[in-house]
Amino acid sequence: MGAGPVIPTRLATVRRRRPWRGVLLTLAAVAVVASIGTYLTAPRPGGAMAPASTSSTGGHALATLLGNHGVEVVVADSIADVEAAARPDSLLLVAQTQYLVDNALLDRLAKAPGDLLLVAPTSRTRTALTPQLRIAAASPFNSQPNCTLREANRAGSVQWGPSDTYQATGDLVLTSCYGGALVRFRAEGRTITVVGSSNFMTNGGLLPAGNAALAMNLAGNRPRLVWYAPDHIEGEMSSPSSLSDLIPENVHWTIWQLWLVVLLVALWKGRRIGPLVAEELPVVIRASETVEGRGRLYRSRRARDRAADALRTATLQRLRPRLGVGAGAPAPAVVTTIAQRSKADPPFVAYHLFGPAPATDNDLLQLARALDDIERQVTHS
């Protein structure tokens, strides 16, 4: 009889635990889903126009749109990758040309097969790959195509942002759109397109009307797109990594943790030893800084009397040893001695050395100049 009530009690305990177990499992599932979502939606770093970068200047959105519309996007990280991926039926997109500084690599890039799309090229890259073009003179920018290019007319109005404009040199047959911000011509058996800005192709620039359409029309007019947007200098002048790049990421965390331990130990030892004791130490300050600081203080408080006393006292301290006059000599004796040495009028000397305080800032300035003249005359007498 005594063992009978135990079984219902245990069942009740198990039933009470089951809801908590379900809540914990639900919270764990939510945490896992949130972690996966955060990982998948986290911004992917990269340089400007990089097809994997999700920053505002990256090209991930355009690369994704092209892939969804059946274009094979091949990412090239080097000139060798471009040469391996380029084909006669492909389009080569070249951006971030400020990193293309090696003429030999530019020559190799110019020989890559297929059509070419140059995005905001530098003068070096433009000269090497499209010598038929030059920068046009500044003119009112036009957001409408105003040309016969099919890709531009389908897109319509485009917000370019800051952009270069181009014009042909010589007798080149050139199709110019948007006031020269987009040009196209045929050379050496391939079609070359040059745009003066990359803003309309970036993640942050696709939203305005016409931008995404023009970007897709230009980059997606071939079934295969080779995307080359370097983020470092390649070739003999290359220096893409530094010594810190060779250090594993975990080492940085370890260093920060060690610093934290040192800080905690310092706080612990400091509490055991006691508070710090202030000790007066000599401080060396330039004389000019002291004078300027004291002058600003006097001026802010309109303490012209104190400033005049300081000037007169300093002048007398420098003149007494030169004149052989003691510190306790009366004022008339000092005035007489200085007047004789400097050939100055005694009332003039007495007024400026022992006279009343100046009434204005200009009077104080005149006093300083007079004291300087008196000291100079005594020194050179």
Curated annotation (Swiss-Prot):
Give its localization. Answer: Cell membrane
The residues the entry assigns to the signal sequence are none
Q: Note the superkingdom of the native organism.
A: Bacteria
Q: Which residues form a coiled coil?
A: none
Alphabetical list of InterPro entries matching this protein? DUF4350 (IPR025646)
Q: Which residues cross the membrane?
A: 22-42, 246-266
Topology in the membrane? Answer: Multi-pass membrane protein
Any one GO cellular component localisation term in the record: plasma membrane
**Pfam families named among the record's database cross-references:** DUF4350 (PF14258)
Please provide the record's keywords in A-Z order: Cell membrane, Membrane, Transmembrane, Transmembrane helix
Specify the protein name.
Answer: Uncharacterized membrane protein Rv3691
Species name: Mycobacterium tuberculosis (strain ATCC 25618 / H37Rv)
